[in-house]
């Protein structure tokens, strides 16, 4: 019994170390959303140019998801996780020295590659570590670290943006990344997972079915709505008459609402099928989106934002939990990386379109109506997914 307890404790300690991947991804995305209006003002950028910063970063994430997801199946999860985090940390050091808009874009692409590769590999590692409904619950709990990363980004921006500036914030992020690398050196590869030299084309041929198309549609809709809404959240707050400090403060409150959303989703994952959890949360997000687009006062904006945050991030956690269960171990990293990479196409388009729409004076309520429709499409796509086969998502195939 003592040995079993020790194994569980060891697995949970490993889980906590791996879950920091979500924290760093959110820390970077959150800081970027706070930095964007500051950099835009300093360099005299149009809204469409500001949106391009986020989109170029996300293009890097797409490339990182495709490449590093496949690499994890070839050289192992642990080594790939360390490589991606090193790329993220060094990239932020260089980014802090950017001298203009063009150099900022180029460096953000490589930072994005590190981030985009880290998250699917971390999800694959946790999927290898657990089985059954516990796998879904632990993946959703891992995704709750996203909220912690956003909170850290909010507090750093609130407390330090006026003292050390956006360059200093990036250096702080890089330092935390280097610390995480030291922690990940001590984790072990999952013993039953063997690295495979499966070519990317072979992996696609083996696993590309109708379910993959439906899954990619769901990922597209989740990331299109999430990045489109949340990357512009501080800017929308500013446009509604709030100061920079008020905007950061309100955004922090909205981010806190993510945590109970995650925990309820994790609990539901132990009670009902994960695809139903996803659909419920996507429809809840759609409700929050239409509310957020049609309110004007600060109090109602924060309330609608909390509803949006509660459901949208729970849906994000649910689809992260769902994806690895659809594929066998030898292609799990590749297909999880590809699914997230395809989803990040939506993450590119979302912020870019919002910037263009704002420049063209499209109303906020119309923009959020579009997000509501996309969320409904995503929920329908997942509900249409077939149930996993007996070998799919198994602990060892």
Predicted segments, located by residue:
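Paired small-residue
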Residues: 91, 102-110, 299-307
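Helix-loop-helix hairpin linking two adjacent transmembrane segments in secondary transporters
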Residues: 141-185
């Amino acid at each position: 019994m003592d040995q079993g307890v020790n194994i569980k404790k060891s697995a949970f300690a490993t889980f906590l170390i791996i879950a920091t991947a979500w924290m760093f991804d959110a820390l970077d995305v959150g800081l970027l959303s706070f930095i964007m209006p500051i950099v835009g003002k300093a360099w005299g950028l149009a809204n469409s140019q500001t949106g391009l910063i986020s989109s170029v970063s996300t293009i890097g994430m797409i490339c990182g998801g495709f490449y590093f997801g496949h690499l994890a199946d070839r050289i192992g999860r642990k080594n790939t996780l360390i490589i991606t985090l090193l790329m993220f940390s060094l990239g932020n050091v260089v980014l802090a020295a950017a001298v203009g808009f063009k150099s900022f874009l180029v460096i953000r692409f490589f930072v994005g590659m590190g981030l985009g590769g880290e998250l699917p590999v971390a999800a694959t590692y946790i999927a290898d570590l657990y089985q059954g409904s516990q796998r879904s619950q632990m993946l959703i709990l891992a995704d709750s670290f996203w909220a912690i990363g956003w909170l850290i980004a909010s507090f750093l921006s609130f407390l330090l943006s006026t003292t050390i500036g956006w360059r200093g914030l990036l250096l702080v992020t890089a330092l935390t990344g280097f610390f995480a690398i030291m922690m990940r050196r001590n984790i072990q590869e999952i013993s039953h997972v063997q690295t495979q030299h499966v070519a990317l084309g072979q992996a696609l041929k083996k696993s590309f079915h109708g379910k993959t198309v439906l899954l990619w549609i769901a990922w597209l809709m989740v990331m299109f709505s999430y990045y489109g809404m949340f990357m512009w959240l501080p800017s929308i707050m500013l446009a509604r008459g709030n100061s920079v400090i008020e905007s950061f403060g309100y955004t922090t409150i909205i981010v806190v609402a993510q945590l109970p959303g995650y925990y309820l989703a994790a609990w539901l994952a132990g009670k009902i099928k994960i695809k139903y959890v996803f659909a419920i949360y996507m429809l809840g997000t759609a409700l929050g989106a239409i509310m957020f687009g049609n309110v004007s006062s600060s109090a109602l904006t924060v309330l609608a934002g909390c509803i949006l945050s509660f459901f949208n991030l729970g849906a994000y956690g649910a689809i992260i939990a769902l994806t690895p269960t659809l594929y066998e171990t030898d292609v799990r990293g590749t297909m999880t990386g590809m699914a997230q990479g395809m989803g990040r196409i939506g993450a590119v388009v979302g912020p870019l379109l919002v910037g263009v729409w704002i420049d063209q004076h499209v109303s906020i309520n119309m923009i959020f109506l579009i997000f509501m429709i996309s969320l409904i499409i995503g929920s329908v796509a997942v509900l249409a997914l077939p149930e996993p086969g007996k070998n799919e998502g198994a602990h060892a195939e």
